[in-house]
């Protein structure tokens, strides 16, 4: 009997004095939770010897979140609306009246669904020329990485790209006439997909007009572009044609200057006694209609030496009478006759 009593006395101090193991688990499991969803932190102990006080902490520095006391192997702390800023490290501790024992750190990741992406064109903007290398850039302003992007022309997939660390992604292609129309992109990160708004690409000289079924086609912009290019050429041709006709009319026009007068010979008498010179007549070309014009010339008489001597002998008064007789009839100044008035 005594040996059994001694064995019992020695065995009692060898029993554990309290809890020895504390662990933290999450729901949903794995430490991943969607933004806006609920996160449950479950703290567990290996044994219960009475009331146990549970503590929940955030971060390595141990910002205390909650405290509960209950005689159970587990206790739960709930965060009802998780935000992206709630992503951090968490741990718990348990105390059964002795020294508290802490669990290991558990990392919590908050998954953020992608927001609606924005599609933009590169340096060319929404104006481009056939043959250009066009860059499509798609970016979701919010969303947990990695983000997967797909690029569309109308409903046809042009290509795809990914952003392992978040942010946006680009896709390049060489522009052809078949690429006229609407473009869009789609972003997803495993938590749902979002589609961007449709953006129309305008080729230089071509307008893109959406139709009822959403497919764009070439409009009258092509006609406007052609007219814009041909108008200066047409004006230049009209001007050259007008100038050519004007030069042709001038070359075919009747002579506007007075015709060269060919005097029909002088019949003036060489006698000193002849006072009155005989007029000369000349017909002028027909200028207008059936009218014929005549010019009458009076040429001063060239005096013979004897006549000149006669003038010097009889003085100035007689010379004046001779001059008066010679120029008694009006003379026609050919140089001032305007043939244009006759037309």
From Swiss-Prot:
A motif (ITIM motif 4) lies at residues 325-330. Phosphorylated on C-terminal region upon BCR ligation leading to recruitment of ABL1. Pfam families: ig, Ig_3. It is found in: Cell membrane. SUPFAM superfamilies: Immunoglobulin. One of its GO terms (cellular component) is plasma membrane. Residues 241-343 are cytoplasmic. It comes from the Eukaryota. It is a single-pass type I membrane protein. This is Fc receptor-like protein 1. It comes from Mus musculus (Mouse).
């Amino acid at each position: 009997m005594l040996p059994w009593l001694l064995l019992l006395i020695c065995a009692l101090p060898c029993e554990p004095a309290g809890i020895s193991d504390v662990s933290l688990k999450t729901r949903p499991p794995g430490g991943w939770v969607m933004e806006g969803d609920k996160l449950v932190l479950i703290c567990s102990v290996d044994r219960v010897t009475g009331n146990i006080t549970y503590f929940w902490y955030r971060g390595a520095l141990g910002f205390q979140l909650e405290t509960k006391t209950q005689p159970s192997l587990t206790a739960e702390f709930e965060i009802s609306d998780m935000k992206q800023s709630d992503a951090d490290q968490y741990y718990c501790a348990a105390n059964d009246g002795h020294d508290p024992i802490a669990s290991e750190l558990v990392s919590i990741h908050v998954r953020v669904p992608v927001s609606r992406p924005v599609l933009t064109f590169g340096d060319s903007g929404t104006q481009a020329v056939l043959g250009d290398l066009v860059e499509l850039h798609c970016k979701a302003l919010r969303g947990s990485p990695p983000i997967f992007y797909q690029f569309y022309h109308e409903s046809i997939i042009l290509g795809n790209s990914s952003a392992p660390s978040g942010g946006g992604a680009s896709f390049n292609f060489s522009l052809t006439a078949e690429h006229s129309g609407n473009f869009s992109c789609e972003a997803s990160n495993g938590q749902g997909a979002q589609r961007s708004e449709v953006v129309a690409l305008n080729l230089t000289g071509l307008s893109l007009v959406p139709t009822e079924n959403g497919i764009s086609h070439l409009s009258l912009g092509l006609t406007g572009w052609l007219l814009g290019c041909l108008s200066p050429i047409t004006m230049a041709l009209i001007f050259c044609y007008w100038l050519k006709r004007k030069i042709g009319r001038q070359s075919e026009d009747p002579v506007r200057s007075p015709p060269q007068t060919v005097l029909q010979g002088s019949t003036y008498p060489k006698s000193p006694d002849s006072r009155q010179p005989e007029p000369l007549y000349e017909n002028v070309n027909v200028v207008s209609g059936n009218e014929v014009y005549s010019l009458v010339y009076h040429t001063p008489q060239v005096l013979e030496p004897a006549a000149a001597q006669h003038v010097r002998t009889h003085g100035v008064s007689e010379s004046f009478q001779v001059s008066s007789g010679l120029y008694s009839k009006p003379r026609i100044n050919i140089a001032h006759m305007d043939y244009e008035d006759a037309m």
